[in-house]
Amino acid sequence: MERQNLIEMEGVITESLPNAMFRVHLDNGFNVLAHISGKIRRNYIRILPGDRVKIELTPYDLTKGRITYRLRKR
């Protein structure tokens, strides 16, 4: 599967929803509905509201995304 045309952005988790879905407020001001990628799910990485994350968006639907990385707290 090609991942060349994905848009990668950063944001903050604002709300935790059922079925491992999250509402994310991106740095550019938009809100996105995102799910957890398989590697994060397999490694039991916990994502909570307030965490900064990296998100992949497809150019076809900019309202949904995939959480690929949880950034460390400073």
Curated annotation (Swiss-Prot):
InterPro entries: NA-bd_OB-fold, RNA-binding_domain_S1_IF1, S1_domain, TIF_IF1. Its main location: plastid. It is found in: Plastid, Chloroplast. One of its GO terms (molecular function) is translation initiation factor activity. Pfam families: eIF-1a. Keywords: Chloroplast, Initiation factor, Plastid, Protein biosynthesis, RNA-binding, rRNA-binding. One of its GO terms (cellular component) is cytosol. Residues 1-72 form the S1-like domain. The keyword RNA-binding applies. PANTHER family: TRANSLATION INITIATION FACTOR IF-1, CHLOROPLASTIC. Belongs to the IF-1 family. Component of the 30S ribosomal translation pre-initiation complex which assembles on the 30S ribosome in the order IF-2 and IF-3, IF-1 and N-formylmethionyl-tRNA(fMet); mRNA recruitment can occur at any time during PIC assembly. One of the essential components for the initiation of protein synthesis. Stabilizes the binding of IF-2 and IF-3 on the 30S subunit to which N-formylmethionyl-tRNA(fMet) subsequently binds. Helps modulate mRNA selection, yielding the 30S pre-initiation complex (PIC). Upon addition of the 50S ribosomal subunit IF-1, IF-2 and IF-3 are released leaving the mature 70S translation initiation complex. HAMAP family: IF_1. This is Translation initiation factor IF-1, chloroplastic. It comes from Mesostigma viride (Green alga).
